[in-house]
Amino acid sequence: MNLVNLENILDNTSFLVLFLTMMIYWVGAAFPSVPYLQALGTAGVAIANLCIAALLGARWIEAGYFPISNLYESLFFLAWGVTAAHLIAQQMSRSHLVGVVTTPVAMGISAFAALTLPADMQTSAPLVPALKSNWLMMHVSVMMLSYATLMVGSALAIAFLFVTKGQNVELHGSSVGTGGYRTGVRLNKPQPVQETAIEGSGNVAVLNTTVVSDAPSLSLQRLSIADTLDNISYRIIGLGFPLLTIGIIAGAVWANEAWGSYWSWDPKETWALITWLVFAAYLHARITKGWQGRKPAILAASGFVVVWVCYLGVNLLGKGLHSYGWFF
């Protein structure tokens, strides 16, 4: 079996595994009493992650360079990053809710790469001279990982907005939160409650999260779900933002070496800056201004669209130094 055939098998396998895993998580959300579905879903994401890693490794061997130079390769690297971010978030939360949100994103990315892209865009080609640099791995890989983590965090924020739709919910406590499902803390009824500090492990004091709502009814289960989604969304975005910052700085250094200018207001650079500003505003609002609940979630949810425009929209327009030029 040659490497090209192996790549074709692996990309289709990763799509199939992610599709089945998505269905497992959705069934698990509908029937939470079934004990083994969450473990099965986590195993499915891990298998998909390994399949994509093997695909990228085979591509690296075949082409002789780090496989992130065209749209097909970057999409699968992005899918790998989303599955990796899922596993991190799953470890943080111990909740099946993460998979309900993240597996459709990863599955959609792999489906677009494996089933939609033209065959000529799925084949490897020699690198253009400008890409023959160690900065290719250092800059692009970090940017793609930041996109993956920010997408996951933003998708969880969208899920939070869906769960709290029509409710004036505000979560009070630390910015990190406690997570009702994750720690087993039973949230209070939707009315103002006095916060009490409890001592956590590692000499870190945390606050029991309480919820204030003007709405007449929001079940304790939905409050716990909302708390978990808000908590993990914040943590994952907090991981992705430094990666985005490092990636932009690395890109500026590479641009100066290649073209003699740190910043040229290329469409990709402009949208990367917009993305950075959106998530900087989100973190500033939560950490400095103390925003909680739906307001920061709306800001994070808008970041989901901004990241996709930055990554895919600008590229497919065929404009600028970062374009893949498929549609136009």
From Swiss-Prot:
Membrane-traversing stretches: 15-35, 37-57, 68-88, 97-117, 142-162, 236-256, 271-291, 297-317
Bilayer topology term: Multi-pass membrane protein
Alphabetically ordered keywords of this record: Cytochrome c-type biogenesis, Membrane, Thylakoid, Transmembrane, Transmembrane helix
Cellular location(s): Cellular thylakoid membrane
Database matches in InterPro entries: Cyt_c_assembly, Cyt_c_biogenesis_CcsA, Cyt_c_biogenesis_CcsA/CcmC
Main location: membrane
Superkingdom of origin organism: Bacteria
GO annotation terms (biological process): cytochrome complex assembly
Gene Ontology terms: cellular component: plasma membrane-derived thylakoid membrane
Gene Ontology molecular function: any one: heme binding
Protein role: Required during biogenesis of c-type cytochromes (cytochrome c6 and cytochrome f) at the step of heme attachment.
PANTHER family in the record: CYTOCHROME B_B6 PROTEIN-RELATED, HEME EXPORTER PROTEIN C
NCBIfam families (UniProt xref): cytochr_II_ccsB (TIGR03144)
Subunit structure: May interact with ccs1.
Annotated family: Belongs to the CcmF/CycK/Ccl1/NrfE/CcsA family.
Name used for this protein in its record: Cytochrome c biogenesis protein CcsA
Organism, scientific name: Gloeothece citriformis (strain PCC 7424) (Cyanothece sp. (strain PCC 7424))
